[in-house]
Amino acid sequence: YDETNELFNNYANGRGLYGNINVYLNFLSLNIEYINYRFGTLDPDNRGNFVDNYGLFQPYQNPPIAINIHENILMNRVSHQINMNNEVGYKIELMGMINNWIDILAIYSASSQSHSWFMDSNYQWKKEGEAALFPHSDKKAATPFQEFYGELSFYMIDQKLHLKAGYSNSYDVTKLFLNTKTDTSSSMYYDLQKSIAIPLNISYTFESGWSINARVETQFYTKGVRQVGTLNGSTVVDTFMSTFYNDKNNNEIPEKNEYLDYETNNFISLSISKSPLWSLAFTLDKTNVSEVINRGNEFENTLEKLFNIDQSRNWVNVEFVYNISSTIRLSLLYGSLKGGLVCTNGICRIIEPFNDGFKMRLTSMF
């Protein structure tokens, strides 16, 4: 390569700021986190173009993310994906004890890009205003994100019975497609996802290390494209096109009367375990929407046949986990897996689904 090539010398100048405050009040603790990352302010069309924008955020930096990392399956699938190059936000977390058998947890997170974006007369993206120190919660052109999560944990029957109930409500503008303005009118298109989730977890511990656990999660998930248009200060267009539909006609083609306002998801897991050796779990993942390509009966697995489950909207599997040692764990899964987005510490990856198969995983912890 040529060291004088502009590609290798045109580095971007950026910076990142993170702050954390902890306050302890008797049986309560308050944690406040703040992030202001501006390694590169890329426009909405180039936000993910790291090939042509060399020298921005690097994965090895791995800075804090200041959002809640969900343990629950359905909420984790719609996790906000942090823009490490340009994001300003904060997280407020309150946790503690109401009494000696009830714990409380409440978390509020908010973030956005540092600038709003609009298109000029040549349809070129331009930044609007000065860089913000706090999130633009009311400016959709800055792709805002907001989430509240609350949780109560109950410890009963001499700490043998553990009940945990939660509630989550999130709002996330994930992509800005268009934002034009004139003296008398404006038009904006953006991708929006909203989620309300209610997780419930019940576990009971017996003598000699035996325990049973039940997890039930329900989610109402909205995703689609919203269009907002104004003329002379009045809103003349405000429409939402949902991504989800229910194929009532069984023709695998989305029709106008089949679109749903939101997707309803259910996740159920029943497990039994013998600490510290093994655990066995039965899992059912259910939705009310249709896939663009129907799975078809040819992919029906043994578990779906046994329980007479509609395989087009349900995924069912059995997983056995064995602890070979204190640091090595073996997992064997059979059935179908919905897959989807899984996020850990701001790093998200897609888990590929399958309809009839096995999965083996060997984990070593250092």
Model-predicted regions and their roles:
Residues 1-366:
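Exposed, low-structure sequence patches enriched in small/polar residues
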